């Protein structure tokens, strides 16, 4: 009966699977009643299938109808795919890290970081609860070098302000730990994350724990009189340790955000293989290779510029020269200022260069200005280059680059105003937030130009990716075919 009318057979084969098509044609031969077709389809368990399916060219030896269910038809995809909720959680947690970086900057600007002289990760969660406890805490602070040399004039009420600034900063850090660790364990145990993502989460958890130790290591450098004497410094934290603390926070932020964006992108690809394969072709284009390298370079420049800003904050170098574009009356400070022998600790002066580059406030400010100029011109040059190559650059990546151009312009303006207005707390804090915003835009841009992971790519290209119809339409077409004479 099948070969009696091949034209009708071809129409039916385009809409039914190998099994359902054979059963349906037998039913058509026996009866033209659509209820019989429904019974046969119900036996093959396709009646209840309401998801979209792909139409493939007809072949008597191959299926024309194949549902896509990751957990059954493609177990490899199940192992590679991570839940969207994991991505949203990671991006949300990265937002908390962004907030604590800004709060840490405020703690530094208000000189509150050394107000808590002990590190108690668990018992230090609660602040002093009564007058007696406050007085005991104040006595501990009075024994610190900062109080003896800088803050001997403050009273208990003033101490409470700087104490709460540091306490909130530490409490926020503990909250991030809980918000990250507990859901990470849940997602891993419930198998909502792939092995690839589990490795990332494990690394981020270790980095988060390290950040807590680095924070106390930094604070201790401002409480130890011997270290202050060795640095010939006033009671303040080491600029090296401050920058390390800042850099660790930046790495933690980047790791969370990058992983979250990657998960969202891969979920989108699995949902729409057609669009994914089209994007793969663009990303495989050799013409986009230079832009991919440029995106990584911009990410590195943004990070290094922010770290040089950390050195400026650690040395209070923002107050050295408060003019722009010149530094004082010159375009550049004198060589004697830049390479001051007073910063050497060796008799042979072999540490002259690196000591001044990292410890001389004048030189450190010049380095930060130079990094800022490099960052701005690099983004500007990349933006101009991308406009010429916009035909080969994905639209979302081009949008991210436009945003980056705006952010770097705003950040440069904030930096100039911060210097001219003698580093007011409000401007300096916004400037620090701008550094992280610039890093964010460069990271998003780089992630959008990144090629897909090979395992995920291999899964995507095997998914059904032609035109789609629904099972309801299949039944409708089968009914029409059944009513036609054979």
Swiss-Prot record:
Binding positions for heme o per the UniProt entry: 169, 245
Effect the entry attributes to changing residue 236 to W: Mimicks pathogenic substituion found in human patients: Fails to rescue the heme a biosynthetic defect of a cox15delta mutant
Entry cofactors: heme b
Phenotype for residue 166 to A: Inactive, preventing the hemylation of COX1 and subsequent CcO assembly. Does not affect oligomerization
Topological relation to the membrane, as annotated: Multi-pass membrane protein
Description of what induces expression: Positively regulated by intracellular heme B levels via transcriptional activator HAP1.
Effect of residue 431 to A/C/Y: Fails to rescue the heme a biosynthetic defect of a cox15delta mutant
GO CC, any one term: mitochondrial inner membrane
Transit peptide start and end: 1-33
GO terms under biological process: heme A biosynthetic process
Role, per record: Catalyzes the second reaction in the biosynthesis of heme A, a prosthetic group of mitochondrial cytochrome c oxidase (CcO). Heme A is synthesized from heme B by two sequential enzymatic reactions catalyzed by heme O synthase (HOS/COX10) and heme A synthase (HAS/COX15). HAS catalyzes the conversion of heme O to heme A by two successive hydroxylations of the methyl group at C8, in a reaction that involves matrix ferredoxin YAH1 and ferredoxin reductase ARH1.
Similarity field: Belongs to the COX15/CtaA family. Type 2 subfamily.
Protein name: Heme A synthase COX15
Gene label: COX15
């Amino acid at each position: 009966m099948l070969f009696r009318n091949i034209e009708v057979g071809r129409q039916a084969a385009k809409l039914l699977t190998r099994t359902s098509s054979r059963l349906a044609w037998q039913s058509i031969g026996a009866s033209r009643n659509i209820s019989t077709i429904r019974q046969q389809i119900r036996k093959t368990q396709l009646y209840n299938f309401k998801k979209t399916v792909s139409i493939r060219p007809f072949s008597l030896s191959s299926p024309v109808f194949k549902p896509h269910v990751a957990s059954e038809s493609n177990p490899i995809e199940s192992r590679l795919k991570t839940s969207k909720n994991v991505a949203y959680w990671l991006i949300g947690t990265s937002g908390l890290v962004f907030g604590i970086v800004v709060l840490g900057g405020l703690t530094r600007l208000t000189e509150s970081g050394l107000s808590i002289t002990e590190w108690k990760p668990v018992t230090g969660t609660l602040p002093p609860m009564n007058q007696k406890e406050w007085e005991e805490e104040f006595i501990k602070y009075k024994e610190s070098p900062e109080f003896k040399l800088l803050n001997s004039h403050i009273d208990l009420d003033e101490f409470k302000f700087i104490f709460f600034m540091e306490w909130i900063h530490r409490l926020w850090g503990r909250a991030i730990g809980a918000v990250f660790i507990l859901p990470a364990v849940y997602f891993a145990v419930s198998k909502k994350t792939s092995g690839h993502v589990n490795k990332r989460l494990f690394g981020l958890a270790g980095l988060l724990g390290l950040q807590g130790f680095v924070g106390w290591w930094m604070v201790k450098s401002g409480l130890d009189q011997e270290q202050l004497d060795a640095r010939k410094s006033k009671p303040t934290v080491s600029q090296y340790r401050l920058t390390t603390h800042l850099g660790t926070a930046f790495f933690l932020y980047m790791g969370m955000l990058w992983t979250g964006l990657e998960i969202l992108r891969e979920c989108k690809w699995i949902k729409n293989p057609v669009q994914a394969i089209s994007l793969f072709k663009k990303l495989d284009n050799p013409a986009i290779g230079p832009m991919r390298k440029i995106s990584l370079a911009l990410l590195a420049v943004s990070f290094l510029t922010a770290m040089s800003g950390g050195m400026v904050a650690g040395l209070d170098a923002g107050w050295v020269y408060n003019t722009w574009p010149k530094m004082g009356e010159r375009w550049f400070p004198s060589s004697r200022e830049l390479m001051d022998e007073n910063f050497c600790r060796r008799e042979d002066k072999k540490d002259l260069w690196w000591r001044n580059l990292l410890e001389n406030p004048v030189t450190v400010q010049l380095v930060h200005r130079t990094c800022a100029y490099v960052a701005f011109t690099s983004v500007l040059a990349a933006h101009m280059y991308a406009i010429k190559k916009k035909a080969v650059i994905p639209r979302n990546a081009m949008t991210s680059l436009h945003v980056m151009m705006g952010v770097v312009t705003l950040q440069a303006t904030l930096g100039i105003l911060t210097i001219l207005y003698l580093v007011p707390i409000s401007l300096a804090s916004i400037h620090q937030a701008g550094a992280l915003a610039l890093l964010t835009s460069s990271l998003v841009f780089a992630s959008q130009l990144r090629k897909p992971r090979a395992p995920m790519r291999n899964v995507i290209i095997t998914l059904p990716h032609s035109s789609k119809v629904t099972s309801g339409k299949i039944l409708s077409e089968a009914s029409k075919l059944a009513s036609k004479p054979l």
